[in-house]
């Protein structure tokens, strides 16, 4: 059973993040200079770089723990988490395709702002942010099976996205779009795949039941 509160929350998040991306697009350069430049001069520059580079691992660990827990305790929720995992892969693939189509250069490559992290090589495009896409996808995958974890996974996803801007490798609209993409695709694919598997399983079970065999004469 999918928690009812998750779907409206996910939709609201997608709409809010999309609006944030649209609003910040016109001021992307000044925002980048303020955030990335300020972070590079801040005593917290090292922390921003660490979260930007390795913060995604925390969400991976939480998701892995949920995989083990649901496999042992609740196979139905494990199935939903597995379907959401497929959605995460689809979200990442979509992000990569969009990157290649749009080919937006990294802000650290076109600007003159000192950044916390080294700028990725040419051809490693900026929009949307892959890290943010995966962060949003993993967060919503966890929330589909364990909504009480929102106080942990939502701040983590936002921290990863924000740190990518602070570290100087993305614009604000890059990470907002990435989060929205990860949440939307993972939610849609995960729920659709899980619902499809459940329908097939129910049909298969009903055909093998004694009542069904007596009805069909088998």
Locations of regions flagged by a protein language model:
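Membrane-helix interface segments
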Residues: 43, 75-80, 108, 146-152
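Interfacial segments of alpha-helical transmembrane regions
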Residues: 63-94
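Alpha-helical membrane-inserting segments
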Residues: 28, 44, 90, 94, ...
């Amino acid at each position: 059973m999918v928690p009812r509160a998750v779907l409206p929350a996910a939709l609201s998040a997608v709409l809010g993040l999309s609006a944030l991306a649209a609003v910040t697009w016109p001021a992307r350069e000044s925002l980048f200079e303020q955030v990335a430049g300020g972070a590079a001069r801040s005593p917290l520059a090292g922390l921003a770089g660490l979260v930007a580079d390795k913060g995604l691992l925390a969400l991976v660990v939480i998701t892995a723990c949920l995989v083990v827990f649901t496999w042992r305790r609740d196979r139905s929720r494990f199935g939903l988490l597995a379907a959401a995992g497929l959605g995460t892969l689809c979200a990442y693939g979509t992000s990569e395709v969009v990157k290649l189509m749009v080919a937006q250069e990294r802000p650290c490559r076109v600007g003159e702002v000192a950044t916390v992290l080294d700028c990725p090589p040419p051809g490693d495009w900026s929009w949307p942010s892959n890290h943010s896409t995966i962060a949003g996808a993993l967060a919503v995958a966890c929330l589909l099976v364990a909504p009480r974890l929102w106080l942990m996974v939502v701040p983590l996803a936002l921290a990863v996205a924000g740190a990518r801007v602070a570290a100087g490798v993305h614009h604000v609209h890059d990470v907002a779009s990435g989060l929205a993409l990860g949440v939307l695709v993972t939610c849609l694919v995960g729920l659709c795949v899980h619902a499809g598997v459940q329908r097939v399983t129910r049909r298969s079970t009903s055909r093998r039941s004694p009542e069904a065999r007596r009805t069909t004469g088998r």
